[in-house]
Each structure stands twice: as C-alpha cells, then as structure tokens.
C-alpha cells in the first residue's frame, strides 16, 4: 500500500473534505497538522510546490490539494496510486 501524507490545518474545510474522501475509500493516511507552524506556507512550498492546504503526497509525490484528489478519485487513478 502506498504512503499517503496530508498537510492540513484545523480551520480548512477542504482538508475535512479530503480526509472524508480518503476515509470513504479506505485509504490510510498520515495527517500532518500545520496549525502551530507559523512558517507553514514556506514549508509547504518547499515540500510540495504548493502553498495552500491541504497538500497531499502519495509515496512522496505531490498530487496537489482537494480538487486534484477528487479528480484522481473520479478518474479511478486514486485507487491505482494508493494501492
């Protein structure tokens, strides 16, 4: 099974949606909360190339945020990547 990591904040509605989607598909993930990281936007940009949350990585490969996750799910690609 792939390693899925998601960078989140508690105030982010799209983070909740992404977690719900992954849980509904039975995909385990590591949630990395950035609530106490004042420099989180710089950290995200360095790690993923994006500065918004959520930022999701599958096996270390940045896939983007909720919209990209949803698109992968709709196309069936998420299941393949997460296997």
Q: Across the structure, where does each feature detected by a protein language model lie?
A:
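Structural micro-motif
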Residues: 48-57, 67
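Non-catalytic interaction surface on structured domains
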Residues: 17, 21, 25, 46-47, ...
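Conserved beta-strand scaffold positions in the cores of enzyme catalytic domains, especially
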Residues: 26-31, 62
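Thioredoxin-like thiol-disulfide oxidoreductase module
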Residues: 33-51, 77, 81
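Local sequence-structure signature of Cys/Sec-based thiol-disulfide redox active-site neighborhoods
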Residues: 1-28
């Amino acid at each position: 099974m792939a390693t899925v990591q998601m960078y989140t904040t508690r105030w982010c509605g799209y983070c909740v949606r992404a977690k719900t989607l992954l849980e509904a598909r039975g995909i385990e993930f590591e949630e990395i909360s950035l609530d106490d990281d004042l420099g989180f936007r710089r950290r995200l940009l360095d790690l993923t190339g994006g500065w918004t949350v959520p930022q999701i990585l599958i096996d270390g490969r940045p896939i983007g945020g909720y919209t990209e996750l949803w698109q992968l799910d709709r196309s069936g690609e998420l299941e393949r990547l997460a296997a």
